[in-house]
Regions:
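Extracellular/periplasmic carbohydrate-active domains that bind, remodel
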Residues: 1-188
Length: 188
């Protein structure tokens, strides 16, 4: 769904992704559409790398943020859809990650995301301080800054994101938090 394309009816299952700067990314500009995506039975392990790489150690990053490159080959289409990413099911994910799982939109541009049966284990990072405590939402012009507390889930600008049956392991003796801002209908 990068830039303005349309992606529908995607199924990702039974995958192992190890030592990745970002494991699972679903992204679209607000003028694209990504819908009806299921990802299940995944083992995701990330680490943040120094340098200018997309991703900042996120095991899951779903982002529907406006970005348009003036030199992109196609003009911005006029679409009627309110949400550019919708109807996503993430099920049976085992995540070992240096950063939070993230669902980031603008004004509800990401909606109806359900995560079920998650295991999340945060781990120490040598390089997270290089980019800062942020979710990498490149190429969007804005940022997604994390709270100072250990954070396992970051939601912003989304609608109807639900999490059920999640186990989040303690990190340095603390229970990581779930952070939500402008997240209508979020339940976790």
């Amino acid at each position: 769904g990068y830039m303005h394309s349309i992606v529908r009816n995607v199924n990702i299952s039974n995958c192992v992704i190890l030592d990745s700067n970002r494991s699972l990314c679903i992204m679209s500009s607000t003028d694209g559409i990504v819908e009806n995506v299921t990802a299940s039975n995944l083992r995701l392990d990330t680490r943040c790398r120094a340098g200018n790489w997309w991703g900042n150690g996120e095991a899951v990053c779903i982002m529907g943020t406006y970005h348009h490159l003036a030199n992109y080959r196609d003009p911005v289409p006029q679409r009627e859809a309110h949400a550019c990413i919708r109807n996503v099911l993430l099920q049976n994910l085992n995540c070992t990650t240096e950063n939070a799982l993230a669902v980031v939109g603008e004004n509800g541009s990401v909606e109806n995301v359900h995560m079920d049966h998650l295991t999340v284990q945060l781990k120490d990072s040598e390089n997270l301080c290089v980019k800062g405590r942020v979710i990498d939402i490149s190429p969007a012009p804005n940022t997604a800054r994390l709270p100072e507390e250990p954070t396992w889930l970051y939601l912003r600008g989304v609608r109807n994101v639900t999490v059920t049956n999640a186990f989040v392991a303690p990190f340095h003796g603390k229970t990581p938090i779930a952070y939500a801002e402008d997240a209508e209908g979020a339940r976790f």
